[in-house]
Regions:
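Short N-terminal edge-element motif at the start of the domain
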Residues: 1-64
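Short, isolated positions within intrinsically disordered regulatory regions of eukaryotic proteins
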Residues: 15, 53, 97-99, 159
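Amphipathic alpha-helical interaction segments
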Residues: 48, 57, 69, 95, ...
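Long, low-complexity intrinsically disordered regions
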Residues: 62-128
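A eukaryote-biased signal for long
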Residues: 107-225
Length: 225
């Protein structure tokens, strides 16, 4: 059982960290511009990263995170890995419009209602390095629309664009565990927001969103005092 940390791991651009996921799996990440973390397709069960070189082609995704995520996640500083230099934040993001409404999803033949998702999603240009007010991830602003209303025919164009949300524990932790299982970037938040069919492996992720007893036992049980 892990003890809840008193404060989040201090932020420093270029700091490489490992995060312990469930079932003893570790993943590598790097702090870039606060509050963005870059996650890499590097997983192991020993938390031993000797010989690992961080490359752009090994990036899973980049996401803004809360201090709550760093506080509740088991984080360790990794000094033996050289940080990826000159990383540029993505410029294409998904904006979820205000006016969230309950949506119904189905996993393993069971329908569940989820709250808090926008009525419409847009692919937008949001240059986080422009120096403009739109850079602030808390404000959710952007420069222009690329696709104002994403439809099924736009899914390929949207690709792996991230939503302009700020991730928390434990939804991000479960997403990373899904990336480990599949060996690639998996994005449940995008799949749910765009109305894509959901695989059975998303069951725990949905459990977290619905605050089910199963999810609380799996994740919060280790962190409650």
């Amino acid at each position: 059982m892990m003890e809840k940390k008193k404060r989040a791991t201090p932020w420093k651009p270029g700091k490489v960290i490992s995060i312990r996921l469930r079932n003893g799996v570790y993943v590598l990440a790097q702090m870039v511009r606060d509050p963005y973390l870059v996650f890499f397709n590097h997983f192991n069960e020993e938390n031993n990263w000797k010989g690992v070189t961080l490359k752009e082609e090994d990036i899973l995704f980049c996401k803004a995170v809360t201090r709550q995520f760093l506080r509740y996640s088991p984080v360790a500083i990794v000094k033996e890995v050289t940080p990826l230099l000159d990383y540029a934040l993505p410029k294409e993001w998904i904006y979820s419009h205000i006016g969230g409404h309950p949506i119904t999803v189905s996993v393993k033949g069971r329908e569940r209602q989820l709250a808090g998702f926008g009525r419409r999603c847009s692919l937008v240009l949001a240059d986080k390095d422009s120096g403009l007010p739109e850079d602030n991830p808390l404000m959710g602003l952007f420069q222009s629309y690329i696709i104002s209303d994403i439809k099924e025919q736009d899914w390929d164009r949207v690709g792996q664009a991230e939503l302009m949300s700020i991730e928390v524990f434990p939804t991000l932790n479960e997403r990373l565990y899904l990336c480990f299982l599949y060996g690639k970037n998996i994005n449940p938040e995008q799949d749910i927001s765009l109305g894509k069919p959901l695989p059975d492996d998303y069951e725990t992720y949905i459990d977290i969103l619905t605050n089910s007893p199963e999810a609380r036992r799996l994740y919060l049980g280790e962190h409650e005092e």
